Amino acid sequence: MSGHNKWSKIKYVKAKEDAKKGKVFARFAHEIMLAAKSGGGDPDLNPRLRAAIDGAKAVSTPKENIERAIKKGTGELGGATIQEITYEGYGPSGTAFLIEVATDNTNRSASELRTLFTKNGGSIGTPGSVAYQFERKGEARIMAEGLTEDSAMDLALECGADDVEQGDSDNEWVFVTSPTELNNVCAALREAGHTVISMKLISVAQNASVINDLETAKAALRLYEALDDYDDALNVFSNFDVAEEILEQLG
């Protein structure tokens, strides 16, 4: 099994801790709302909601925040309607970006993202302009102390996942599968005694655009961070990777 996610290098370079910025709570709240909206407020009947709740608990999200997000998603609490939408754009050297946002105003989000792209050397695209360069996959994350790479691979095979790699910390593991098998893989991971802290669909670049120039790498990273910092952003995907020798200069 080979690593599916070129972002492991990018995350290493960025070394960004969203929790310190208070963004993790907000992202889990959005995910819980969207999960409850699409599949109902009972986590026993809604695998996506269950994973979102477990993930929120793993980062110590207050119980009342979780309950409020569920009620907003099911409509029990009033307020603006949140919807999930994907925007597309181009970065330095024609690199491709997808940004999934949770928003109550698509026109506002489009305008704000257009500004972010422009300020950081990119341009927002039209629907379908770069999406064809990505493939949809299912992703499940668990926290498991003491799991080695070999045992993680064995677990992936047992649970029917296509791939596995280490996540953002030593104890986090990311399992990748086809979208249609995501629920089954999550169920198998839980059956094996693991808590799934995140399950979602992701976009994986079919071909990486390798950056071999220091200034271009800096520009691409600035754009990625600007998009990732956007308040309504849920996920940011891109097809760029950074060459090892450039990565060392950035380190």
From Swiss-Prot:
Give a GO molecular function annotation for the protein. Answer: DNA binding
Keyword Isomerase included in the entry's annotation:
no
**Might you report a single GO cellular component term?**
cytosol
Q: Which Pfam families match?
A: TACO1_YebC_N (PF20772), Transcrip_reg (PF01709)
For the keyword Transcription regulation, the answer is: yes
Q: What is its main location?
A: cytoplasm
Biological-process GO terms, alphabetical: regulation of DNA-templated transcription
Q: Write out the entry's keywords from A to Z.
A: Cytoplasm, DNA-binding, Transcription, Transcription regulation
Similarity remark: Belongs to the TACO1 family.
User: What is the protein name stated in its UniProt record?
Assistant: Probable transcriptional regulatory protein Amuc_0709
User: Lineage in the entry?
Assistant: Bacteria, Pseudomonadati, Verrucomicrobiota, Verrucomicrobiia, Verrucomicrobiales
